[in-house]
Regions:
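C-terminal helical "tail/cap" subdomain of flavin- and related membrane-associated enzymes
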Residues: 311-395
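Predominantly flavin-linked oxidoreductase catalytic cores and closely associated redox partners
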Residues: 110-247
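Conserved N-terminal glycine-rich FAD pyrophosphate-binding loop of Rossmann-like flavoproteins
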Residues: 34-54
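FAD/FMN-dependent oxidoreductases across multiple families
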Residues: 227-310, 314-315
Length: 395
């Protein structure tokens, strides 16, 4: 009998397991895959993610992988490049965009070090119930017999297509249409100047440095164009890239080091994150378009919130259901603005005149430009930046 079973050992599950194990709870951490391994997911460690890694004592391990700090963000929106410097507090060197085979290994190692019990290549097939309460899981290891494990709470950190969410019947509190598709790969022997974002009315590109001297270059567009794009990825990527001559020249001077990775399975959904004996964290409970790159940051924030709530309940400081209700309230309050922002950013078409005017005004002040790009990485509050007094000063 465990205090908690965490299903999924990636960016949401491993930190949740680590934090609970550090409080002395008996935690079973289950992962369908194995480590180290890359997965199709976001790379970005925005400021909230970097700050959590620092507080957990794991940032140095990420830096030790050789992933370079990112200190600059350039944004081209069909008009001109607007480049801002990133100013992170607490002496942090920058944000990072590590390969998941490195980041996920660091996170799962930290969970195991904290005494969580890890089982890799274990597929959860169903939940165990007593009345209306979840009391455990049923699943099997690779090639093994079906087994059952029981716990006070089962936490689903198993991503967008969460088995825990499905079996628990987690309702969608908010569901919006899929807006975009994405394809990306990695290049060697080229350069990027921090994060480079290029948006046109009908498609966009993104480039940034990652581990092993590689640079990720991504292209994305409206979801209704996905079928056509995937028929000839090379030709369509070249066509998009030609719209950014400087980036095209750098890509041409490099070498694509890995296969193309892409999907249009990018729904925008906010699920009920708890019920009797179960809870959700990370993409299992909240998935949004990746254009804002908030996924890992939200997973880390959610892991801390949920671990604190579960600890409060298991330790008897408050009823577990009450603690989980507070977790939901705080998660929803933070998630809704992110969901709204992601859906706006993922909607292609001409930019509003107000945004074009703001960009023109920002060209007159590097400090204001730095604050503007700071919103993208989590160091600046959009409410503060877009406050009437601040807009009046800038415009």
């Amino acid at each position: 009998m465990y205090d908690a079973i965490v299903v999924g050992a990636r960016c949401a599950g491993s930190p949740t397991a680590m934090l609970l194990a550090q409080q002395g709870y008996r935690v079973l951490l289950l992962e369908r895959g194995s480590f180290p391994s890359d997965i199709f997911r976001n790379h970005a460690l925005l400021y909230p993610a970097v700050a959590h890694l620092q507080s957990w004592g794991l940032l140095d391990a990420v830096i030790a992988t050789g992933c370079p700090p990112i200190t600059q963000f350039s944004q081209f929106m069909g008009d001109f490049n607007l480049t801002g410097k990133l100013h992170l507090p607490d002496g942090l060197a920058g944000i990072y965009a590590p390969r998941r085979k490195y980041l996920d290994q660091i996170l799962v190692d930290a969970a195991v070090k904290a005494s969580a019990e890890l089982r890799e290549e274990f597929a959860v097939q169903d939940l165990l119930w007593e009345g209306d309460r979840v009391v455990g899981v049923r699943g099997r290891s690779h090639g093994g017999a079906s087994v059952e494990e029981r716990a006070t709470i089962v936490i689903g950190a198993d991503g967008l297509h969460s088995v825990v969410a499905r079996c628990a019947g987690a309702a969608a509190l908010e569901s919006r249409p899929t807006l975009t598709w994405i394809y990306y790969s990695y290049w060697s022997d080229m350069t990027t100047a921090g994060v480079e974002f290029y948006r046109f009315d009908d498609e966009a590109m993104l480039a940034f440095p990652t581990n092993d001297g590689l640079h990720c270059v991504a292209t994305f567009g409206p979801v209704d164009g996905f079928s056509d794009y995937r028929t000839d990825i090379e030709a369509n990527f070249a066509r998009t890239l030609a719209r950014v001559p400087d980036l095209a020249a750098r890509v041409a001077g490099g070498r694509r080091a890995e296969r193309w990775i892409g999907t249009s399975d990018l729904p925008n959904v906010l699920r009920k994150p708890y019920g009797p004996g179960w809870a959700l964290v990370g993409d299992a409970g909240f998935h949004k378009d990746p254009v804002t790159a908030h996924g890992i940051s939200d997973a880390f924030v959610g892991a801390q919130l949920l671990a604190d709530a579960v600890d409060a309940g298991l330790a008897g400081r408050r009823p577990l259901a009450e603690a989980l209700a507070a977790y939901e309230a705080q998660r929803n309050a933070e998630a809704m603005p992110v969901l709204d922002g992601a859906c706006i950013a993922a909607t292609f078409g001409p930019l509003p005149a107000e945004m074009l005017g703001l960009r023109q005004a920002l060209r007159q002040s590097q400090d204001d430009t730095d604050q503007f790009v700071g919103m993208a990485v989590g160091t600046v509050s959009p409410m503060e930046f877009f406050a009437p007094a601040n807009m009046g000063r800038i415009m």
